[in-house]
A protein has these predicted regions:
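Macrodomain-like recognition of ADP-ribose-binding/processing modules
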Residues: 1-261
Length: 261
């Protein structure tokens, strides 16, 4: 099967999955939407509570697993823990290119859950403004996110934090310097941590956020995550990066270390 045939097949699966989620979980989807919260920190205005100072250290794990598998393993090992998956999100489109047949991390989350049905409900109040001309901050985007509780992943429910990393691949073409990009990346990771702590997450499923098509340096991402989450009320940080031979996995292993699975 060629690339386009496979993409068409994935698009058909995405459409069928979305319809099935609507039939099976419309009530649960509506409840998750109602209990979701949009976070922002822009132009000196923010609605994220400053985390209380802590001297606690999180346990750090590096797993050769996709995000959903990692969350399920964590749930099996710690069934009473609150688990949140970081969605490596598109800034402009709910579910990224899920419905067009793409299969990056966000799209994979949508294929495994009712997340796409949830994010569609935010198109007008969240994504539409991001698609307006001049709204992308030269593709660095802004510190904006959606925290959604109880997203259904088959027999499990996990919270999902939807947040786009700065898009260095695009930003570099708009005259953005590497220093500007790194400053935005570090600020966004601080933003993510504050949201996770505000929502009293026990286990956060993170990863090589932004180090795919967005072009972030995985070593830089790993360094900023390691620095920012050094002290945290979150008990366990799982960096979920499929393929131990990948550049991303090797970068995280060198910088973060932790228990490897």
């Amino acid at each position: 099967m060629g690339y386009w045939d496979n993409k068409q097949s994935m698009a058909a699966q995405a459409a069928a999955h979305t319809h099935q989620m609507m039939l099976n979980y419309e009530k649960e989807t509506t409840e998750s939407v109602k209990n979701s919260k949009i976070y922002y920190s822009k132009d000196g205005i923010n609605n994220v509570r400053e985390p209380a100072p802590t001297t606690c250290h999180s346990a750090v794990e590096l797993w050769d697993k996709d995000s959903v598998t990692a969350a399920r393993i964590a749930c099996t090992e710690h069934p009473d823990s609150k688990i949140c998956i970081l969605n490596f999100a598109s800034y402009k489109e709910p579910g990224g290119k899920f419905i067009q047949g793409s299969s990056a991390q966000e799209e994979s989350l949508c294929h495994a859950s009712n997340l796409y049905n949830i994010l569609l409900r935010f198109d007008k109040v969240y994504y539409a403004s991001h698609r307006e001309k001049g709204a992308t901050n030269r593709s660095l985007y802004y510190n904006e996110a959606i925290y959604t509780p109880n997203v259904i992943f088959s027999n499990n429910k996990f919270d999902v934090l939807t947040c786009a990393a700065p898009n260095w691949s695009a930003a570099s073409r708009f005259g953005v310097s590497l220093d500007e990009n790194n400053k935005a990346l570090k600020s966004r990771i601080e933003f993510i941590k504050s949201i996770l702590e505000e929502n009293k997450v026990d286990i956060a499923i993170l990863g090589a956020w932004g180090a795919g098509v967005f072009g972030q340096n995985p070593a830089t991402v790993a360094t900023y995550f390691s620095e920012e989450f050094y002290y945290s009320s979150i008990s366990t940080i799982v960096y979920s990066i499929p393929d131990k031979n990948s550049i991303n996995y090797r970068a995280f292993k060198e910088i973060i270390g932790g228990n490897c699975l």
